[in-house]
């Protein structure tokens, strides 16, 4: 570059820089004021005319007009002359309200402004703004003046100012100033007030006015607040911040929003809301920010001011990119309180956006917003006065349906209650009497929380002979500590138990008095930590059937009798007699007796007759009520009659040593006295001779000396009657009775022999069934020590616990059948306490079954009882075993059939993870098994025997009618990878339970796993009586086939079945699950070569949908050394960890609430689902590359063996799913028997087990699409119109009468 060019360029740069600086200075503070033409401060125009103003300046110009409502405005450029810029303002057709200031200034600087005031004279509108109604004028308390803005359109217009009601003071009038451009300026004192102010003027004899109202404004401002306090919004939402403050009447607050110290000019809303008129006024200003971005987060400041007084408040706005909904317990989730107190549940909710639906539930029932018992505010639930019925589970369900977010948590409320005694409310009024020398039972039923303890006490009455009232002899003495020195009744038993009464658990204590002989007071005291309650039971012993009565009830005319009024001692007192005329019988004519159990008062009546004995009345004071009671004598007078005989004695011949009985039936008034004579000598009682009250004579072991004439004489005051007979003794006295001796000797010998036989049998036999414990189950399951049928015969069957009436069982369609039995669907009415009618499965024999078959089914029943109840096994519900009717076993009904069929049916609906939009319906297994995952090392159900612990079905899975109606069909839900892990986890739990009961399954496969409601799987065909048949004909029919595909090498080669061989089968079962029901070892002949390869360590490749962790678990189960395989407890731990990892990977939170209850409470409310993962929904590729990738290098698979040998052993004839093989001699007929390949259960369904899948080589995989099409986020939801039908349940878990491998 030349020096010249360089100099030119430098000069040009300096020139440009100088020009810019000069331009900036010109535009800055050094700019000259614009020039406005025509000149002058004011201009007068006339209405309808045209106003023209010209403004010249150095930069672009800007006009500010007097009114925006001008008729027509035109701004145009004009000749610039000396100035660079010129603007002309032209307004045509001027109006009166165009009067005002017109200003011109530079656009970029308003500091330099020129203006002029234009009057537009209009005779019809002398005022620029005229108000016919009072227009408010505002002035603060400390303002020195105020302006009445009645400007005029003509500068010389004469205007008068008037005030009404409150006239102006003279000094104020003198200080008033008039300016046609402003109006009147009026001096103002702090407490001056003018109600109405009027500006008056006249034009051409026409009067014009404008009315104003002065309002004195306050300077008070307080309680400035911003709502919401902690605003949180999502990107794209609208942010609304409301700033409010309080002032008094006539206060005017000015609000101003700032963000990052800049004034905000966004859309806003201004409103005022009076809280209480004339005292407090709340004014507010809302800031609305639509379509929020991340740049809008930060601190927003609101300033509220009245004149010079200001208040300021700031809030921090947080902006999130993604929605979320979380809820936790603010305090404890368990609350224990007492009645009458206030309880509040305050969950901590963290959600953006806020939930659009908040519902509280009490024990699964939605709480109404108008509930009088519960008060809801925001997320909180308040119980003002807790009652006992409020105890239970409270659940808050939060949802944002638009975002697909659902959460809930539960609180448990325990209401502690002071003890209450049930008998106090239902006991009869007044004390009761207790019969002497008899057994009595006293019951005390107490309710309280915590459950109260009951203690019995005793207080005897003072035994002094002259006392008629029970004065307690001692303080209350505990029953177990009563000293022998105190009077007491012998106690047989005192026991307490917890029972259900009126749907509440109550403590029921029973005191059994062996014999009643002492009066006193028993009391039961129920005590818990809140207090105690005592019920007194007066125990008055009585030796008569009635507590208050008159004796006797009959008499003979002419006799002297004694009427006795008798009452129970301590219950009645002050006995008094009244004659038929109502006169009180004097005390000297009565006799009072106080006995241990009665008090009586007697009077003597001589020569009684029917006329004067009627109407005697006894009165007494009932002590407990202090009321007088009476009873009237109902004496019956019988006329005197002589005795007569009903029949005469007859002569008899009596064998020696026999018994002689002579009856003398005589009647009379009074009752005659019977006397016996023998040969005219009175007969008296002695050894072998009995005289009964009714006149019967009994002589035992008659001898020759007893022969003679026996005479019966009946006598009373009316005379005597007699009859006689001759008694002859037949036989010799000294000759023994041979028949008796023979009979006695024979009986004694038979008894002795029977006892010896029983002792001999008991010595030979093993321990009885009563001694069978849990550990003995291994012997039951091991037929080598004792035949299984003999062991089962010794197992107990408790008919009281398990027997179910056949008439309450309604049989339905047949679900499956086998060679000798069948399984039918049935409805059982009242089989449990949860549901009225329950769908069950019934196993029963076919018509014509043999006795051996009956014994086999009975053996299965006993083993089911002994094994016990568990959630993940098919459980026993009852049985019908009564003779004369069919033998039936009632078990749980699993509506979705076996797991193998179900998995195959779901191949088109399998997704790895649920999509984020939540449209795909998710399996509910996660929800139902949340507690299993949480406590995976604990047993889900009782591991004890149901025979000893009782059986109550888990309520979470009961199929009551309401829940059954609301259960959603699993076939309408997609199947996820998490469900497959969950199935494996549940089977491991069930097998862990069976292993703890020392039960070996021996046929663990997907076909023997049933699927029930709520995605619960149950193991069937476990350890039952498979070897009870020894009939060789049955074996020849095919039941000797073995499930080789599932068998461990030691079971195939050495016939050894252990829990570890079940672990091998569990690994094959996992392979079935993660291949969605495919047949194991696809494409292989199950022959001797296969078994040898298996023993050498060749294994299956990974299934299509497994991960490396899952496949490694399978390989661990297939370890060649049984002792190196994991136990089922370890598998539960491992799968539980995988299941938890799956949950955490998807960001889900399992929440313990029954979805059916929510649906029941509110049909519109969907079941709470988990927050879904944002990753895409897709299926794992089904090619071989996936399987090889996750296979350990040290494991050789059958696919590699096939490729090495250069052979393709795909089974073309339909390889058996069950993989059942025969002995080596029978392997030639394998293809012919494939239709029978599966072990035939005793009541299995006739179902073919052929594999319908095509098994391809790895090289051929690319030619065919995968089994399951890939799903995107949009098509992951199911077609609502698709009709899904579940296959019939597979009930092949019934007794399989197949002999074990030998």
Swiss-Prot record:
Topological domain spans for side Extracellular: 29-740
Domain Ig-like C2-type span(s) in chain numbering: 34-115, 143-206, 222-318, 326-412, 419-542, 545-636, 643-728
Membrane protein topology class: Single-pass type I membrane protein
Signal peptide start-end: 1-28
UniProt modified residues of type Phosphotyrosine: 1029, 1034, 1150
Subunit annotation: Interacts with isoform VEGF165 of vegfaa and isoform VEGF171 of vegfab.
Biological function: Receptor for VEGF or VEGFC. Has a tyrosine-protein kinase activity. Combinations of multiple VEGF receptors are required for development of different blood vessel types in the embryo. Involved in angiogenesis, specifically in VEGF-induced sprouting of new blood vessels. Particularly involved in artery formation. Does not appear to be required for hematopoiesis.
Protein name in the entry: Vascular endothelial growth factor receptor kdr-like
């Amino acid at each position: 570059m030349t020096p010249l060019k360089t100099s030119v360029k430098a000069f040009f740069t300096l020139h440009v820089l100088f020009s810019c600086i000069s331009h900036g200075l010109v535009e800055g503070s050094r700019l000259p004021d614009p020039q406005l033409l025509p000149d002058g401060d004011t201009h007068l125009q006339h209405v309808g005319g045209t106003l023209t103003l010209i403004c010249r300046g150095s930069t672009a110009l800007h006009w500010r007009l007097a009114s925006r409502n001008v008729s027509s405005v035109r701004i145009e450029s004009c000749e610039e002359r000396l100035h660079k810029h010129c603007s002309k303002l032209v307004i045509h057709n001027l109006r009166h309200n165009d009067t005002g200031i017109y200003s011109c200034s530079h656009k970029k600087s308003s500091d330099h402004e020129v203006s002029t005031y234009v009057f537009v004279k209009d005779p019809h509108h002398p005022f620029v703004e005229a108000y016919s109604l009072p227009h408010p004028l505002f002035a603060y308390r400390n303002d020195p003046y105020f302006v009445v803005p009645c400007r005029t359109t003509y500068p010389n217009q004469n205007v008068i100012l008037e005030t009404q009601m409150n006239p102006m003071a003279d000094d104020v009038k003198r200080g008033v100033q008039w300016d046609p451009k402003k109006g009147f300026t009026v001096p103002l004192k702090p407490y001056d007030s003018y109600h109405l102010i009027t500006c008056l003027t006249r034009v051409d004899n026409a009067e014009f006015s404008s009315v104003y109202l002065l309002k004195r404004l306050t300077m008070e401002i307080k309680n400035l607040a911003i709502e919401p306090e902690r605003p949180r919004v999502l990107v794209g939402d609208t942010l609304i911040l409301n700033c409010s403050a309080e002032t008094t009447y006539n206060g005017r607050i000015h609000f101003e929003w700032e963000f990052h110290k800049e004034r905000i000019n966004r859309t806003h809303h201004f409103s005022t809301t009076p809280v209480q008129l004339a005292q407090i006024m709340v004014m507010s200003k809302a800031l609305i920010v639509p379509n929020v971005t991340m740049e809008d987060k930060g601190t927003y400041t609101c300033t509220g001011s009245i004149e010079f007084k200001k208040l300021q408040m700031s809030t921090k706005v947080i902006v999130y990119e993604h929605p979320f909904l979380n809820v936790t317990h603010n305090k404890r989730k368990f609350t224990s309180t007492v009645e009458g107190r206030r309880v509040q549940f305050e969950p901590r909710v963290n959600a953006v956006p806020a939930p659009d639906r908040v519902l509280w539930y009490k024990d699964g029932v939605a709480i109404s917003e108008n509930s009088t018992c519960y008060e809801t505010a925001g997320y909180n639930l308040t119980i003002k006065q807790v009652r006992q019925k409020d105890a239970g589970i409270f659940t808050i369900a939060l949802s944002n349906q638009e975002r697909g977010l659902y959460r809930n948590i539960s609180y448990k409320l325990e209401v502690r209650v002071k003890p209450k005694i049930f008998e106090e409310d239902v006991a009869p009024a007044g004390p009761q009497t207790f019969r002497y020398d008899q057994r009595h039972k006293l019951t005390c039923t107490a309710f309280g929380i915590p459950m109260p303890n009951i203690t019995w006490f005793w207080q005897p009455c003072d035994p002094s002979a002259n006392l008629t009232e029970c004065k307690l002899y001692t303080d209350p003495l505990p029953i177990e500590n009563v000293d022998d020195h105190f009077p007491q009744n012998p106690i047989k038993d005192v026991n307490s138990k917890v029972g259900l009464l009126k749907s509440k658990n109550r403590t029921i204590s029973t005191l059994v008095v062996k014999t009643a002989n002492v009066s006193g007071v028993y009391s039961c005291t129920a005590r818990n930590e809140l207090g105690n309650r005592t019920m007194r039971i007066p125990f008055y012993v009585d030796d008569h059937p009635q507590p208050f009565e008159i004796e006797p009830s009959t008499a003979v005319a002419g006799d002297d009798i004694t009427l006795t009024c008798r009452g129970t001692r301590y219950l009645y007192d002050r006995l008094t007699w009244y004659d038929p005329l109502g006169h009180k019988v004097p005390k000297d004519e009565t006799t009072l007796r106080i006995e241990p159990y009665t008090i009586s008062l007697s009077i003597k009546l001589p020569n009684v007759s029917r006329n004067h004995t009627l109407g005697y009345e006894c009165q007494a004071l009932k002590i407990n009520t202090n009321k007088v009671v009476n009873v009237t004598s109902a004496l019956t007078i019988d006329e005197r009659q002589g005795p007569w005989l009903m029949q005469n004695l007859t002569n008899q011949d009596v064998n020696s040593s026999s018994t002689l009985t002579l009856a003398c039936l005589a009647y009379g008034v009074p009752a005659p006295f019977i006397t016996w004579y023998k040969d005219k000598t009175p007969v008296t009682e002695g050894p072998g001779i009995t005289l009964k009250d009714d006149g019967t004579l009994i002589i035992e072991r008659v001898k020759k000396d007893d022969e003679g004439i026996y005479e019966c004489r009946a006598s009373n005051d009316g005379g005597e009657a007699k009859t006689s007979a001759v008694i002859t003794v037949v036989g010799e006295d000294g000759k023994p009775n041979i028949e008796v001796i023979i009979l006695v000797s024979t009986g004694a010998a038979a008894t002795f022999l029977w006892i010896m036989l029983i002792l001999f049998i008991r010595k030979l036999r093993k321990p009885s069934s009563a001694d069978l414990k849990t550990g003995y189950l291994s012997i039951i399951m091991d037929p080598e020590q004792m035949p299984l049928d003999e062991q089962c015969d010794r197992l107990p069957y408790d008919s009281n616990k398990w027997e179910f009436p056949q008439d309450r069982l309604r049989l339905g369609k047949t679900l499956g059948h086998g060679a000798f039995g069948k399984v039918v669907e049935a409805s059982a009415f009242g089989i449990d306490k949860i549901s009225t009618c329950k769908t069950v499965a019934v196993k029963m024999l076919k018509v014509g079954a043999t006795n051996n078959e009956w014994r086999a089914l009975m053996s299965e029943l006993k083993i089911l009882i002994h094994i016990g109840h568990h959630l993940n096994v098919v459980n026993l519900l009852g049985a019908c075993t009564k003779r004369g009717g069919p033998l039936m076993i009632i078990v749980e009904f699993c509506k979705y059939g076996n797991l193998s069929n179900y998995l195959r049916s779901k191949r088109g609906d399998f997704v790895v993870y649920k999509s984020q939009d939540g449209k795909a319906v998710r399996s509910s297994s996660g929800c139902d098994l949340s507690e299993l995952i949480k406590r995976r090392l604990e047993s889900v159900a009782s591991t004890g025997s149901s025979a000893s612990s009782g059986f109550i079905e888990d309520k979470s899975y009961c199929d009551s009618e309401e829940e059954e109606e609301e259960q959603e069909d699993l076939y309408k839900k997609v199947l996820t990878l998490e469900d497959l892990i969950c199935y494996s986890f549940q089977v491991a739990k069930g097998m862990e339970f069976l292993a703890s009961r020392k039960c070996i399954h021996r046929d663990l496969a997907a076909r023997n796993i049933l699927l029930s409601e709520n995605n619960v799987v149950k193991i069937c065909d476990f350890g039952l009586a498979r070897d009870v048949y020894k009939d060789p004909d049955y074996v020849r029919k095919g039941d000797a086939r073995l499930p080789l595909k599932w068998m461990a090498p030691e079971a195939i080669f050495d016939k050894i079945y252990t829990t570890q061989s079940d672990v091998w089968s569990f690994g094959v079962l996992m392979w079935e699950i993660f291949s969605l029901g495919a047949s194991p070892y696809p494409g292989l002949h199950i022959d001797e070569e296969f078994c040898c390869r298996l023993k050498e360590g060749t294994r299956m490749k990974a299934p299509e949908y497994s991960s490396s962790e899952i496949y490694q678990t399978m390989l661990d189960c297939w370890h060649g050394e049984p002792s190196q395989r994991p136990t089922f407890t370890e598998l539960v731990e491992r799968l539980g960890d995988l299941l938890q990892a799956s949950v955490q990977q998807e960001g889900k939170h399992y929440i313990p609430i029954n979805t059916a209850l929510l649906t029941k409470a509110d049909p519109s409310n969907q079941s709470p689902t988990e927050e879904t993962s944002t990753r895409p929904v897709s299926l794992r590729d089904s090619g071989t590359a996936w399987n090889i990738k996750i296979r350990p290098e040290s494991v050789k698979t059958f696919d590699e063996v096939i490729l090495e040998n250069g052979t393709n052993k795909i089974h073309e004839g339909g390889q058996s799913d069950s993989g059942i093989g025969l002995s080596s001699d029978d392997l030639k007929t394998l293809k012919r028997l494939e239709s029978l390949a599966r072990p035939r259960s005793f009541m299995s369904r006739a179902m073919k087990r052929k594999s319908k899948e095509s098994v391809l080589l790895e090289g051929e995989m690319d030619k065919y699409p995968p089994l399951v099409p890939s799903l995107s986020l949009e098509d992951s939801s199911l077609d609502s119109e698709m009709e899904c039908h579940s296959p019939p349940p597979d009930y092949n878990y019934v007794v399989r009468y197949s002999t074990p491998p030998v």
